[in-house]
């Protein structure tokens, strides 16, 4: 029987050992991910500030509170887009996405708004086939880290880790995606928690709906 990790209930002690019940373990970030221009600590701080400001982790409510208009469109392939038009910010979402994927795309686009608004303004916005591949674009990894930090609270994540849950169990319990769970582990590792770094797909937002 695998030994379960013990996470203090207060979660203030960062000497946490993650049990090897996770499905796949890696020691490095996926090859090809370019160095971030926004540090993980800055992303975590920005995401936490927005959650505190809006009082919610719901991406639609966050978008509304931040003055971003969310519009649904029958895209053929792309999942979403972020644009700044005449200083007005827009998020476009494919109108037939699975609810979990819809939330992930919304959170991802909110990450671009929070972290990359200036770049988006310069290039006329971001589209799915340009932005959802972390292997080719450093901003994608940053936006996905932001999405993981917004959607998954430290407390919920660590409580499930204490129970010995693996990535799939955590994702299922928190109505999330295993890749966001792995990215959440990255953010906690950066804060000093001794978790085993988890493998995640560099283009996970490309899967169907």
Residue ranges and their predicted role:
Residues 1-209:
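Active-site hotspot residues in diverse enzymes, especially metal/ion-binding acidic/histidine motifs
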């Amino acid at each position: 029987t695998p030994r379960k990790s013990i996470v203090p209930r207060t979660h203030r002690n960062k000497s946490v050992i993650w049990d090897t019940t996770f499905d796949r373990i890696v020691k490095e970030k996926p090859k090809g991910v370019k160095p971030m221009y926004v540090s993980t600590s800055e992303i975590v701080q920005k995401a936490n500030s927005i959650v505190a400001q809006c009082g919610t982790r719901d991406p639609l409510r966050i978008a509304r509170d931040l003055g971003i208009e969310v519009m649904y469109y029958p895209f053929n392939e792309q999942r979403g887009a972020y644009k700044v038009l005449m200083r007005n910010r827009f998020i476009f979402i494919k109108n037939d996405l699975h609810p979990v994927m819809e939330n992930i795309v919304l959170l991802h686009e909110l990450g671009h708004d929070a972290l990359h608004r200036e770049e988006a303004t310069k290039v006329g916005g971001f589209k799915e086939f340009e932005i959802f591949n972390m292997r080719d674009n450093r901003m994608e990894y940053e936006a996905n880290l932001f999405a993981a930090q917004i959607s998954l609270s430290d407390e919920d994540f660590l409580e499930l880790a204490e129970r010995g849950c693996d990535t799939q169990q955590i994702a299922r319990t928190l109505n999330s995606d295993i890749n966001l769970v792995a990215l959440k582990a990255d953010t906690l590792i950066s804060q000093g928690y001794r978790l085993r770094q988890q493998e995640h797909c560099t283009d996970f937002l490309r899967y169907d709906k």
